């Protein structure tokens, strides 16, 4: 085979030497880690590296919390598939997550971060997300790992095992190969993207956005059950009295879900909770008439009626405020168009407007300005990090 064979990816360095990427010459080789001693050994080796690739496989179908099925770790030499169902002492892995000298590399990491926080009460720091790196290289806002591996490494990642059961044991060879591949290719991909990013002015912006993802993960875990009613679709259509019922019902549902580790919809569907809050049924027959399932009424009906009785005793002074929708404001359409045009003109060369500001972050900024809520802890995303100079100009346009 010629050393210039186009099917073999190469890294090009400034000294003109060409280095073949080892991960592209061979399928991933790995070990399955199933005991505390082996985990300690793996993590001690990883602690000596400047960067490691991480991924997780988990299940979240009928449960409130994701069920961790596997952790993948690649330190540049060894791929370790860590079995969380077999290991009892994860302190070496937690120490690795927290080690400030080891960069943790993930791809599209928001769900992985939630799993780490839930299981280990520790986020990977420092952390960089290759999907965010790709965003600043003009590769789309949500480029998948398989797409990037194809583009930069000329390899195809088989995604056939994506939807399999990661809790059932033993894991199949296909599952293990799939899981190993995600980190096997992630590390060399990171090194390529790192070199590409160094040619741009966006290295700090990538770090800022990775920090933003970490901060959002903390906020998600700290969600207040008293505010769970705000997550119910169409809650804004209810008046304060109806919202007082919904607040009681949604808080109850979330607390039960956490206590019993059940998906929210397995207790009562959100649309049915909304109907109960709207219509205030007096008996289980009325619940059935408004569309609740027989199972919901049989298992939860009596409890729901007790909660409604409790809600009737709430003073009108303690009702939640009506939910304001920014899109209902008569100024909204003109303002959002103005800001979108402003973002287009302020977007730096090499970036797309979608990276600078989404409709959601523009609405967040409008609310912040119009409500005069200028507390630092509630500052919108557009006034944080690399976006701040642009956000400040948008604020000026709103005044």
Swiss-Prot record:
GO CC terms: cytoplasm
Residue ranges of every copy of the 3'-5' exonuclease domain listed in the record: 31-197
Record GO terms (molecular function): 3'-5'-RNA exonuclease activity; nucleic acid binding; nucleotide binding; ribonuclease D activity
Alphabetized InterPro entries for the sequence: 3'-5'_exonuclease_dom, HRDC-like_sf, HRDC_dom, HRDC_dom_sf, RNase_D, RNase_D-like, RNAseD_HRDC_C, RNaseH-like_sf
Pfam family, one: HRDC
Cofactor: a divalent metal cation
Name of the protein: Ribonuclease D
Entry's EC annotation: 3.1.13.5
Span of domain HRDC: 239-318
Domain of life where this protein originates: Bacteria
UniProt-annotated location(s): Cytoplasm
The reaction(s) this protein catalyses: Exonucleolytic cleavage that removes extra residues from the 3'-terminus of tRNA to produce 5'-mononucleotides
Alphabetical list of PROSITE patterns matching this protein: HRDC
Biological process, per Gene Ontology: tRNA 3'-end processing
Keywords annotated in UniProt: Cytoplasm, Exonuclease, Hydrolase, Nuclease, tRNA processing
Enzyme class of the recorded protein, top EC level: hydrolase
Signal peptide: none
Function statement: Exonuclease involved in the 3' processing of various precursor tRNAs. Initiates hydrolysis at the 3'-terminus of an RNA molecule and releases 5'-mononucleotides.
Family: Belongs to the RNase D family.
